[in-house]
């Protein structure tokens, strides 16, 4: 299986999984034209679309893609029904595509119906967990987001994190604001600055690596707790919520 991505809008990625025979699936097509053009240019055969949630930068191209490829399956949670979904998914579902099993995880927090798709070694998690960060939390659903991130971070360390936005640099800058003396994050920040200047991507990342650079996965770290004014006895969730609120105001 080959993993590719198509850049759209200002910082979105549409992920593509492709097998050796040229059949493919795509995840969260926020636009239609660049996706259709790439599929036609590469002579791929689109089999399915997977949607993680209902925000327009993840779903905006779906209906036109369906018009162009009317036989495809479109999977998504209930909140994405208006975007042409013909197969509603929920937590615990198993989907077989391209001879691979995709497990559906309910990962709310960013939206109330957000889902993620796991097919070893890939986790397509939309706007839940980002490299060095996590998605915005709406309607004060911090506990839901915390639990969703726990689901993703509990996957094997070798799992490839395929999130939907190129936010890594900004997230690392926030991490340095919180932990200015973390040399590992400092070095990685410099590396990402160089990659982005060269027109390269920071994604995908690995779960094991995220546990080092992503403060939202370091909620039991006493250095993190101290840096945001919490006692060492506080809960991991308290750390998560404080970090997320700080990130909201920082950015």
Swiss-Prot record:
CDD domains membership: hydroxyacylglutathione_hydrolase_MBL-fold
Reaction it catalyzes: an S-(2-hydroxyacyl)glutathione + H2O = a 2-hydroxy carboxylate + glutathione + H(+)
A molecular function GO annotation: hydroxyacylglutathione hydrolase activity
Record keywords, A-Z: Hydrolase, Metal-binding, Zinc
Cofactor note: Binds 2 Zn(2+) ions per subunit.
Residues involved in Zn(2+) 1 binding: 53, 55, 110, 127
Pathway(s) of this molecule: Secondary metabolite metabolism; methylglyoxal degradation; (R)-lactate from methylglyoxal: step 2/2
Coiled-coil region list: none
Record flagged with keyword Metal-binding: yes
Listed EC numbers: 3.1.2.6
Pfam short name (any one): HAGH_C
Transmembrane segments: none
Enzyme's top EC category: hydrolase
Binding site for Zn(2+) 2: 57-58, 127, 165
InterPro entries, A to Z: Clx_II_MBL, Glyoxalase_II_hydrolase, HAGH_C, Hydroxyacylglutathione_Hdrlase, Metallo-B-lactamas, RibonucZ/Hydroxyglut_hydro
Entry superkingdom: Bacteria
Gene Ontology biological process terms, A to Z: methylglyoxal catabolic process to D-lactate via S-lactoyl-glutathione
NCBIfam families to which the protein is assigned, alphabetical: GSH_gloB
Function, in words: Thiolesterase that catalyzes the hydrolysis of S-D-lactoyl-glutathione to form glutathione and D-lactic acid.
Family affiliation: Belongs to the metallo-beta-lactamase superfamily. Glyoxalase II family.
Subunit structure: Monomer.
Record protein name field: Hydroxyacylglutathione hydrolase
Organism: Buchnera aphidicola subsp. Acyrthosiphon pisum (strain APS) (Acyrthosiphon pisum symbiotic bacterium)
Classification lineage: Bacteria, Pseudomonadati, Pseudomonadota, Gammaproteobacteria, Enterobacterales
Gene name tied to this protein: gloB
